[in-house]
Every structure is written in structure tokens, then in C-alpha cells.
UniProtKB/Swiss-Prot annotation:
Domain of life: Bacteria
NCBIfam families reported for this sequence: hrcA
Keywords: Repressor, Stress response, Transcription, Transcription regulation
BP GO annotations: negative regulation of DNA-templated transcription
Protein name: Heat-inducible transcription repressor HrcA
GO function terms (MF aspect): DNA binding
Annotated function: Negative regulator of class I heat shock genes (grpE-dnaK-dnaJ and groELS operons). Prevents heat-shock induction of these operons.
Family as reported in the entry's similarity comment: Belongs to the HrcA family.
Gene: hrcA
InterPro entries noted in UniProt: GAF-like_dom_sf, HrcA, HrcA_C, WH-like_DNA-bd_sf, WH_DNA-bd_sf, WHTH_HrcA_DNA-bd, WHTH_transcript_rep_HrcA_IDD
Length: 352
């Protein structure tokens, strides 16, 4: 059982090490602790902390550094989010001050803002697709039996794909099919549109075209593109600043993790309906990829009411200043949520 003084010493070692990157010795602790404690007493307490595996000695110094076990204990029992100074608050608020034209623009830019604020790698995911509605659909003839299918959503995204129309489908049939979509699907959530596309829409289209399969495939393909969750990454190169790896192929593998959407989703362990109202921290030894053993991943959800939830993540060194980063993430998600809620309100007003 650790004493209150030992817990204070552990907390101080982590604070000093994450601020300076230098091992912490008893003399430094003696000058930093809020009460007077002799150097000998501090050394005894540090020995006890080392015996239970919460701190460890480095080869190059007589000081001590936190162990993975020490970081986990600190994160689970001791940490308190830092109170940010007014300059930090103003910087975050001003970063979201500009005008944005669509949801993806806000979410992608937020990753860049957060990476610039922290010098780490930031990852953002927009609000869940369940809340996004279909607001427009059209086909633009390009000639030679080709058309461009265009879908517009309430998130402000415009997705398009070029398709070759089967010879069996006439221009008149296409116009009627578009009318069916506009009459029955516009204004509905994309998840509902996808369901109706399989159940109700085929029967409606059969009234106007003999074989609606070609049109349904076109609409389904561009709908899937519009429904894809989009992960945005800011500060990719920051990840390499804290790597202890020297092998070029391993460094490339780390870089690829955050540039491949499947690998990134796996790293974030995205699960439908799972929400973190508090900042969660996974240390390197708690992640499945050994290349990230010297990194930590911080994640937290942000809430935009009826429009669902999104996610913010920060990937940095295990020795990052957790207290400050948690305080910053809490503020950042509040400001991002406000910006998105304002966007949705403006969008809804423009549609009414």
C-alpha cells in the first residue's frame, strides 16, 4: 500500500519527466515537492516505488523515470486535467473562427488544428453517418452511354461517380427513376435510404422500367461512397519525431498505419455505438501493434446532439504531458461540437 507521500512523489516524477524528458533525481524532487522532505526520505520512497514497478532506473542517469505500470497507475488513479490558461482557450476558439462550407471541411481542418497545437499526430472522425440525410440526387449525361451520378447530403458533402448506362435503359426511364428517388428518398437518413433501396424502391421502379437492376446498382454505389466514414489525420510526420526506431522499413510501417483507413480504424478500435464521454488513454504496451510500443493513444468522443457523435484521437509519445493533453482535448471537443452544431443549425435553416 503506497503512502500519500509516495503517491505525491510518483505524480511529481511523471510531471517532471513529461515536461523535460530527463530522469528525475531526489534533489530535484526535494526542491519541487510542496512540503519539506529530506533527500534520504525521498530516496527511500523512490526505492519503494521502484520495487513495486512504478518507476525504473535508466542506464545513463542516477535519476528515475516512470514505467508503463507507473503511467497506467497515474492515469487510473492520480491524474487531473490541467486548467488551461486563457491564451490556450483563445487559440482553440480562434482556430474555429473561420467559415466552413461542409462538415468534412470542419472535421478535416480540426485534425490539422489539433496537431499544430500539440505537435503530435491528430485523428478526427466526423459525426456518425446515421444522422446524415440525403438532400439531393441527379444524373448528368456525359455522352456515349455515360452519366455522372451525384449525391448531396446534409453534411454538405457532394459525392459523384461516372457510370456506363446499360443499353436497355432509355433516357426517359432514367428521368422517371430519378423522380422516384426524389419523391421517396430525399430528406431521409442515408441508413434508411439504403434499406428502402433494397426493399421498396425496386418495386416502384418496376412501374417505369423493365429491368431496374442497372439503375439500382448505380445509385447504390454512389450512396456507399457518400456513406463512408471519413477519418482525417493531421501532423502525420509528427509521429516520426518521437520514434526510437532507426530501421527505415519500420518507420515506413508506422507512417503507413496512419495513412491506411483500415489500419487506422483498427488502431482506434472503432465500434458502432461505443462512446467515450471521458478521455481514454491506451499506452504502447496496451496496443496490438508492436511498432507503437513507445507511443500512447488518447481518444474521446464529441457529441452533436441528434446528429450523432464523432471521435478525436491524439497519438504521441508515452512521455507526453497527459494532464495538459486531457485538458486540451476536453476543450477542443467542446469547441468542435459547437462549430458542428452551428453548421447543422445554419444548414437546417437554409432547407426550411
Amino acid at each position: 500500500m503506497l503512502t500519500e507521500r509516495q503517491l505525491m512523489i510518483l505524480k511529481e516524477i511523471i510531471r517532471l519527466f513529461t515536461e523535460s524528458g530527463q530522469p528525475v533525481g531526489s534533489k530535484k524532487l526535494m526542491s519541487e515537492l510542496p512540503m519539506h522532505v529530506s533527500s534520504a526520505t525521498i530516496r527511500n520512497d523512490m526505492a519503494d516505488l521502484e520495487n513495486v514497478g512504478l518507476i525504473e532506473k535508466t542506464h545513463s542517469s542516477s535519476g528515475r523515470v516512470p514505467s508503463m505500470k507507473g503511467y497506467r497507475y497515474y492515469l487510473d488513479h492520480l491524474i487531473q486535467p490541467a486548467v488551461l490558461n486563457p491564451m490556450d482557450v483563445a487559440t482553440v476558439q480562434q482556430s474555429f473562427g473561420r467559415h466552413y462550407h461542409k462538415i468534412d471541411e470542419i472535421v478535416s481542418q480540426s485534425a490539422n488544428i489539433l496537431s499544430n497545437l500539440t505537435s503530435y499526430t491528430a485523428i478526427t472522425l466526423g459525426p456518425e453517418m446515421a444522422a446524415i440525410r440525403l438532400t439531393g440526387f441527379r444524373l448528368v449525361p456525359l455522352g456515349n452511354h455515360q452519366v455522372m451520378a451525384i449525391i448531396v447530403t446534409s453534411a454538405g458533402t457532394v459525392d459523384n461517380q461516372v457510370f456506363t448506362i446499360p443499353n436497355a435503359i432509355s433516357g426517359d426511364e432514367l428521368e422517371k427513376a430519378i423522380r422516384v428517388v426524389n419523391d421517396h428518398l430525399i430528406g431521409l437518413p442515408l441508413t434508411v435510404v439504403s434499406q428502402k433501396l433494397k426493399i421498396e424502391v425496386p418495386a416502384l421502379l418496376m412501374q417505369y422500367m423493365g429491368s431496374p437492376g442497372g439503375f439500382l446498382n448505380i445509385f447504390d454505389d454512389v450512396l456507399k461512397q457518400a456513406s463512408q466514414e471519413r477519418l482525417y489525420v493531421g501532423g502525420q510526420s509528427n509521429l516520426l519525431n518521437f520514434s526510437e526506431l532507426t530501421d527505415v522499413s519500420q518507420l515506413k510501417s508506422i507512417y503507413n498505419i496512419i495513412n491506411q483507413s483500415d489500419d487506422l480504424a483498427k488502431l482506434l478500435e472503432l465500434s458502432p455505438g461505443e462512446a467515450n464521454s471521458q478521455v481514454q488513454v491506451r499506452l504502447g504496451n496496451e496496443m496490438t501493434n508492436d511498432l507503437l510500443k513507445n507511443y500512447s493513444l488518447m481518444t474521446v468522443n464529441y457529441d452533436v446532439g441528434e446528429h450523432g457523435q464523432g471521435l478525436i484521437a491524439l497519438l504521441g509519445p508515452t512521455s507526453m504531458p497527459y494532464s495538459r493533453m486531457i485538458g486540451l482535448l476536453d476543450l477542443f471537443r467542446e469547441e468542435l461540437a459547437k462549430k458542428l452544431i452551428d453548421y447543422y443549425a445554419d444548414f437546417d435553416d437554409s432547407q426550411s
